[in-house]
């Protein structure tokens, strides 16, 4: 008889765990929401061109940083395709904008070619990259992103037009929460995803037909999926079995 395993939460981590444990264990997957997937959520939008699968959460990945996810997609025979990922900034009140497409997007506004402030900003980009890598190699006493930006005297222009809006966009955070982000976690994520490399970027991929494609593929392999079942507590019994009251 197989040992029973309960997995709480059917986001990408819960689904992948259930998929890889299903052959060795009697897996039960519990989800408080009406459907599985969590952050991996796809909405179908209809227009005059037909149906379009739009992801509202997890959208892109790359092979160097997501080898296990790529392996999961390959095991499921779920196709994926190349995609673009870029960052754009637009200050509407001042009609100031640029994007990370090098070199044209960097100078999307022609007036930036003769802007001393903007050229100093570009210099700060390279200084940020250098200091970030130095900090990762030899962490000091700085604990938050705010500490780092203040200690190295980065300009308000650099903070407000690059690092803070980009960080806020990545993690869906407010500017204040981005400032308080743990420094090493912030820099390590940027380094791992080659965001500190200003020119050479990894080739990004996206799941064909949206992330719901792999959510559905995993669910087709699972027998015991319990949606609308919120787990309220987990307690060990003397026999070391796990008791999971739910409703």
Each model region followed by its residue ranges:
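N-terminal Rossmann-like FAD-binding beta1-loop-alpha1 element of flavoenzymes
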Residues: 3-29
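Short loop/edge segments at beta-strand edges and connector loops
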Residues: 9, 82-84, 227-229, 235
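Short glycine/proline-enriched coil/turn segments at helix->beta-strand junctions
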Residues: 22-26, 219-224, 245
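Glycine-rich FAD pyrophosphate-binding loop
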Residues: 22-46
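N-terminal glycine-rich dinucleotide-binding loop that anchors FAD/FMN and/or NAD(P) in oxidoreductases
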Residues: 43-69
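Mobile amphipathic helical/loop "lid" adjacent to a hydrophobic cofactor/ligand pocket
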Residues: 63-188
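Helical element adjacent to the flavin cofactor pocket in flavoenzyme catalytic cores
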Residues: 186-234
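Conserved beta-strand-loop-beta-strand element in the redox core of flavoprotein oxidoreductases
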Residues: 230-247
């Amino acid at each position: 008889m197989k040992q029973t395993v309960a997995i709480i939460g059917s986001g990408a981590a819960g689904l992948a765990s259930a998929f890889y444990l299903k052959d060795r264990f009697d897996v039960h997957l519990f989800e408080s929401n009406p459907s599985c997937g969590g952050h991996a959520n796809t909405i179908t939008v209809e227009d005059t061109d037909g149906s379009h699968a739009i992801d509202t959460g997890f959208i892109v990945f790359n092979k160097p940083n997501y080898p296990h996810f790529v392996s999961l997609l390959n095991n499921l025979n779920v196709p994926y395709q190349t995609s673009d990922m870029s960052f754009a900034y637009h200050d509407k009140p001042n009609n100031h904008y640029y994007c990370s497409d090098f070199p044209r997007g960097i100078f999307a506004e022609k007036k930036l070619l003769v802007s001393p402030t903007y050229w100093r900003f570009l210099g700060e980009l390279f200084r940020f990259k250098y200091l970030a890598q130095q900090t990762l190699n030899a962490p000091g006493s700085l604990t938050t992103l705010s500490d780092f930006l203040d200690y190295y005297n980065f300009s308000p222009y650099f903070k407000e037009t690059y690092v803070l809006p980009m960080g806020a966009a990545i993690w869906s955070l407010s500017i204040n929460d981005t400032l308080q982000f743990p420094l090493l976690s912030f820099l390590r994520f940027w380094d791992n995803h080659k965001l500190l490399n200003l020119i050479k970027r990894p080739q990004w991929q996206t799941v064909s037909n949206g992330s719901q494609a792999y959510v559905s593929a995993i669910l087709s392999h699972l027998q015991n999926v319990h949606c609308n079942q919120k787990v309220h507590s987990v307690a060990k019994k003397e026999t070391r079995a796990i008791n999971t009251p739910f409703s």
